[in-house]
Amino acid sequence: MFSLLKPKGAAKRRKIVGRGPGSGLGKTSGRGQKGQKARNTSPRLGFEGGQTPLYRRLPRKGFSNNDYKLEYAIVNLGDIDKKFNDGQVVNYDTLLENKLIRKKNKKIKILSNGKLTKKVSLEVSKISKTAESLVMKIGGTIKLV
């Protein structure tokens, strides 16, 4: 096992530059003669040789309000019917326990997909009108938090 050799070409030798003409990479170290690429540092990203760069030629445009956008975790009445019993409270913590929402969503919106047959008391951020009427018809309660 310790006498195994690497296949040919698997381990490349490191380039040692600037160590005399006999090495093949002496004097200019494989960088050619003069010019920007022969110098020590390369120009910064977006630099176009002194010409006004593209990012300054084009106007700034647009606006995004995504950082302040409210995102709701959507829960359907059918899902609540499957996971909850009569008289139970449906809020952020109980929905999290039953894995109907993920942790990152703090706001909950209830939609009317599916059938609700159990009386539950909802403590949510938002609820659709049809979902609200279905919950009230059964005799459940709604508290907007």
Swiss-Prot record:
Molecular-function annotations in GO: rRNA binding; structural constituent of ribosome
Coiled coil regions, renumbered to chain: none
Cystine pairings recorded for this chain: none
Entry GO terms, CC: cytosolic large ribosomal subunit
UniProt keywords, alphabetically: Ribonucleoprotein, Ribosomal protein, RNA-binding, rRNA-binding
InterPro entries: Ribosomal_uL15, Ribosomal_uL15/eL18, Ribosomal_uL15/eL18_sf, Ribosomal_uL15_bac-type, Ribosomal_uL15_CS
GO biological process, one term: translation
Domain of life: Bacteria
Chain intervals with Gly residues compositional bias: 19-33
Tagged with keyword Signal: no
Region (Disordered): 1-58
Quaternary organization: Part of the 50S ribosomal subunit.
Chain's role: Binds to the 23S rRNA.
Similarity comment: Belongs to the universal ribosomal protein uL15 family.
Name of the protein described by the UniProt record: Large ribosomal subunit protein uL15
Organism: Borreliella afzelii (strain PKo)
Highest classification ranks of the organism: Bacteria, Pseudomonadati, Spirochaetota, Spirochaetia, Spirochaetales
Gene: rplO
